[in-house]
Amino acid sequence: MVGKHCILELYGCDQYKLNDEAFVRTSLTAASKIAGAKLLNMITHRFQPQGITGLALLAESHISIHTWPESRYAAIDVFTCGNQTMPEKACNLLAREFGAKSNLLKSFIRDTPHHMEDLTRNP
């Protein structure tokens, strides 16, 4: 297994939290920690008149969020490599933090095809 990719849709969220850049950054940091991932860097951008996009770069991959406060909606991806992290825990935390009334979570195992040749060569 290369890793796990979780796609999270949050509905009925707190619109003020969805438009608070500092809150989004704090939530991404907490999600990284609870997933057992190492946060390397973070970038966020606040749109006018509303909405935020954020990316938490992890040693294990990434967490991204895109918010639409006017629709009380957020789209989140959590992708972690290896089997030492728990991306579902990050998703659960983010759903709670943003006060989602409902959510939809899809999880996928990411893996290389078993039939592919190992391209590592010895000199």
UniProtKB/Swiss-Prot annotation:
It catalyses: S-adenosyl-L-methionine + H(+) = S-adenosyl 3-(methylsulfanyl)propylamine + CO2. GO terms for molecular function: adenosylmethionine decarboxylase activity. It comes from the Bacteria. The active site is at residues 61, 66, 81. Its cofactor is pyruvate. Disulfide bonds: none annotated. One of its GO terms (cellular component) is cytosol. Pfam families: AdoMet_dc. Pathway: Amine and polyamine biosynthesis; S-adenosylmethioninamine biosynthesis; S-adenosylmethioninamine from S-adenosyl-L-methionine: step 1/1. Keywords: Autocatalytic cleavage, Decarboxylase, Lyase, Polyamine biosynthesis, Pyruvate, S-adenosyl-L-methionine, Schiff base, Spermidine biosynthesis, Zymogen. Its EC number is 4.1.1.50. The record marks 60-61 as: Cleavage (non-hydrolytic). Binds 1 pyruvoyl group covalently per subunit. Is synthesized initially as an inactive proenzyme. Formation of the active enzyme involves a self-maturation process in which the active site pyruvoyl group is generated from an internal serine residue via an autocatalytic post-translational modification. Two non-identical subunits are generated from the proenzyme in this reaction, and the pyruvate is formed at the N-terminus of the alpha chain, which is derived from the carboxyl end of the proenzyme. The modification Pyruvic acid (Ser) is found at residue 61. One of its GO terms (biological process) is spermidine biosynthetic process. Belongs to the prokaryotic AdoMetDC family. Type 1 subfamily. Catalyzes the decarboxylation of S-adenosylmethionine to S-adenosylmethioninamine (dcAdoMet), the propylamine donor required for the synthesis of the polyamines spermine and spermidine from the diamine putrescine. HAMAP family: AdoMetDC_1. Heterotetramer of two alpha and two beta chains arranged as a dimer of alpha/beta heterodimers. This is S-adenosylmethionine decarboxylase proenzyme.
